[in-house]
């Protein structure tokens, strides 16, 4: 089958939104399909939004037997056999409209843009043969904002067999983009309240230097700089595998994330427990409190208690890690299941 994988991308910004497309491409090719990736650039600027939407609308993929669309606004592409694996809305116009992350005024002009966008999204989503999401969180948003029913289809990682458990040192690792909404600052602030010598390792690239600088200053001011390793870059896969093999646990504490996130899944493949928070969204679909990880209130004191608990009770941490790995099978997070559903 000839399959086109369609998505948008932010130039020079990597992340899970690229992985889901590129890893699916490899899985489809391994199953004997002919695959093309179709990317168009996306810039978060309201005045460019409709031009970007029109660019997708005029893409001609008639040569494909089927298209699978991921990141907005790729779902606007026309095709008689359009499948959508929806990973998030343009959130400032949806669930982040009333938050600090909107980034533009809630005036008449932007309300008009918001309403027109939602109308166009809903119409394009209705064109699909089938709509999947990457989480129940996103399915709930599709139902709430667009009146669209969708099936959660959890994205696996590539090369899951490379992740393994080797030991448990004194580090809690957080490997993801370093951005304010990922809340690495919450982890650094929490370390100040820890009573154990637990350490923190933050790995990932940032879109700018301001937030990274603020993390370093926070660590210095809190007197915990000697217990925070801050690696502002995309570490290699080999480094990631090593960090997860040896760490005490992983932490992933974003604000109302769309899905459980690859950091959660990679840690589980390494049989390590995951620390998250009650307002983190998608990770709560995977993490079960005190079963395969810990869920804390999003305050430094509460997160510190969880970090200390992971450190002081290594046997419980080991047991939760084993359960985290088993959770992957419980939720059918594997490429065979993904292909079966997308190609049905």
Positions of the model-derived regions?
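Acidic donor-binding loop of glycosyltransferase active sites
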Residues: 244-259
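Short hydrophobic beta-strand element within catalytic cores of glycosyltransferases
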Residues: 269, 273-277
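C-terminal alpha-helical cap of glycosyltransferases
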Residues: 332-344
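A short, well-ordered alpha-helix in the C-terminal region of glycosyltransferases
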Residues: 302-305, 309, 316-330, 337
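Nucleotide-activated donor-binding/catalytic signature segment of Leloir-type glycosyltransferases, i.e.
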Residues: 212-234
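A conserved mid-protein helix/loop that constitutes part of the nucleotide-sugar donor-binding site
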Residues: 19, 170, 179-193, 213
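Membrane-proximal helix-turn-helix segments that form the acceptor-binding/catalytic region
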Residues: 102, 107-131, 139
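Conserved acidic donor-binding segment of nucleotide-sugar-dependent glycosyltransferases
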Residues: 289-290, 294-300, 309-314
């Amino acid at each position: 089958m000839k399959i086109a994988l369609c998505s948008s991308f932010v130039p020079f910004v990597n992340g899970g939104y690229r992985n889901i497309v590129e890893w699916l491409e490899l899985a489809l090719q391994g199953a004997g399909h002919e695959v093309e990736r179709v990317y168009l650039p996306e810039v978060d600027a309201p005045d460019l939004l409709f031009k970007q939407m029109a660019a997708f609308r005029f893409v001609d993929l008639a040569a494909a037997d089927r298209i699978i669309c991921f990141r907005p606004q790729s779902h606007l592409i026309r095709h008689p056999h359009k499948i959508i694996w929806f990973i998030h809305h343009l959130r400032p116009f949806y669930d982040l409209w009333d938050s600090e992350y909107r980034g533009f005024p809630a005036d008449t002009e932007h309300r008009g843009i918001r309403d027109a966008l939602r109308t166009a999204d809903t119409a394009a989503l209705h064109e699909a043969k089938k709509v999947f999401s990457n989480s129940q969180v996103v399915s709930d948003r599709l139902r709430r904002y667009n009146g669209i029913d969708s099936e959660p289809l959890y994205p696996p990682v590539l090369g899951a067999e490379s992740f393994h458990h080797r030991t448990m040192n004194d580090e809690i690792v957080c490997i993801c983009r370093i951005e304010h909404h990922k809340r690495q600052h919450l982890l650094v602030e929490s370390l100040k309240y820890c009573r154990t010598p637990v350490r923190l390792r933050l790995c990932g690239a940032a879109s700018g230097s301001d937030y990274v600088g603020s993390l370093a200053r926070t660590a210095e001011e809190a007197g915990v700089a000697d217990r925070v390793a801050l690696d502002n870059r995309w570490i290699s896969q080999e480094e990631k595998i090593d960090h997860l093999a040896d760490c005490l646990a992983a932490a992933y504490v974003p604000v109302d994330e769309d899905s459980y996130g690859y950091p959660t899944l990679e840690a589980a493949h390494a049989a390590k427990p995951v620390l998250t928070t009650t307002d983190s969204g998608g990770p709560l679909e995977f993490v079960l409190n005190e079963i395969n990880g810990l869920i804390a209130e999003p305050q430094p004191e509460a997160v510190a208690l969880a970090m200390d608990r992971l450190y002081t009770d290594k046997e419980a941490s080991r047991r939760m890690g084993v359960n985290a790995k088993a959770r992957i099978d419980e939720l059918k997070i594997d490429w065979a299941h993904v292909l079966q559903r997308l190609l049905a």
